[in-house]
Amino acid sequence: MKQVQTKRDWKKLAYDVVEEKMITKEDAIAILEADDTEVLEIMNAAYIIRHHYFGKKVKLNMIINTKSGLCPEDCGYCSQSIISEAPIDKYAWLTQEKIVEGAHEAIRRKAGTYCIVASGRRPTDKEVNHVIGAVKEIRETTDLKICCCLGFLNEDQAGRLAEAGVHRYNHNLNTHANNYESICSTHTYDDRVDTVQKAKQAGISPCSGAIFGMGETIEERAEIAFELQRIDADSIPCNFLVAVKGTPLEGQKELTPVECLKVLAMMRFVNPTKEIRISGGREINLRSVQPIGLFAANSIFVGDYLTTAGQEPTADWGMIEDLGFEIEECAL
């Protein structure tokens, strides 16, 4: 007689997490390896944790790409890298006025956090000053929380951004340490961890996540979540690879919608109190199951991404309302 495999009690695991019992790496791998028919049970369990810590609130974030392309790094997934042949817009820094205008557009889109992003390995001191000028005006004229993503930072730059009023700094780990050399050769995994730590030491809330679907194993996928727990990232963007034509990862098989849901649920189980954001690839990879993702995640980007299009803000507002959730405005 064929032995029937007993399914996991996902709800019990969720209640254990709510009672502050940490799950194991084996538990995380079990979520990722669960049969696709269990995904709704897993998402229901993830929602127990999500609701316990965040209720029905959804945080909206908006990106402005203040400097596009022209990056000397060779990250294989990125359309802005020096080795990319993707047909993207390339431009130097936007003016401070344009950056400030973007902040007011973020408010119109009901975003609470405004993310100032620039391509490149690391900013010069002059470029940091350029951002600081815009940040100060935004702080004086809005209640927005400000996140910056400018590349590697030194201690002085991190301190000056903190003093200017930057609330959060994004620097993703991107992939597992074991997989990093296959993705990028111009800097190391440890370089990325170092910048996250410098931002945190300066008093800036650390935002760090990963891009899933870049050849990492299931075990590595789970270990990424625990590494983000270790570095104590307050906000965790879960990106799903969009295999952009003209990049080295063109043709890479993208994750299925169900695989993406399992990643989001696993990340919620491992990092129960953290902001989990469905980020790049949301519309392309999750497709029609986007709303289900919010049963694990509590944050999304509204509008376009760096070089790929998002959906209309009204579609995101409607999705949140249809779920019975609420937009948390002006919240970090």
UniProtKB/Swiss-Prot annotation:
It comes from the Bacteria. Gene3D superfamilies: Aldolase class I. CDD domains: Radical_SAM. Belongs to the radical SAM superfamily. Biotin synthase family. It comes from Bacillus anthracis. [4Fe-4S] cluster binds at C71, C75, C78. This is Biotin synthase. The gene is bioB. Keywords: 2Fe-2S, 4Fe-4S, Biotin biosynthesis, Iron, Iron-sulfur, Metal-binding, S-adenosyl-L-methionine, Transferase. Its cofactor is [4Fe-4S] cluster; [2Fe-2S] cluster. Signal peptide: none annotated.
